[in-house]
Amino acid sequence: IILTPYFIPKDKTIWKALVDARKRGVHVKILFSPHSDALLVKEAAYPYIRKALTQGIEVYGYKNGVLHGKVFLIDKKVLMVGTVNFDSRSFHLNEEMNCYIQDPIYISKIKPVIDEDLQNSKRVTSSDVNQLSIKEKMKEKVAKIFE
């Protein structure tokens, strides 16, 4: 599972890794924040959410305000927590730092928090991102320019 306020995986290597994992049968979940402290971030995520859904990747939108955590949990064995958003700026431009944790006791304490965040989220469907209002479609086009 990947928790990120911004889901804009423009980087082809990162996108390919997600898709390849899914093709290998890995259950990939993305939890992002549709409510953001940054302009047009939700709209910039729409094309990637559409692509993720077509690849069988589950996408969830956090309902209880702004989700600002950056967490990756892999097979309940590796936890990554830090400052990296799931976007090209974090991967290539900003100075970011993550901590990799493999301590099963620590992970077992964090997992329920992640599960609670998922429970406080709505699973995104194709119709959610394909039946946008005219206003949202326009915002998506503008977001694409600045991505």
State each model region's role.
Residues 6-147:
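PLD/PLD-like phosphodiesterase catalytic module centered on the HKD motif
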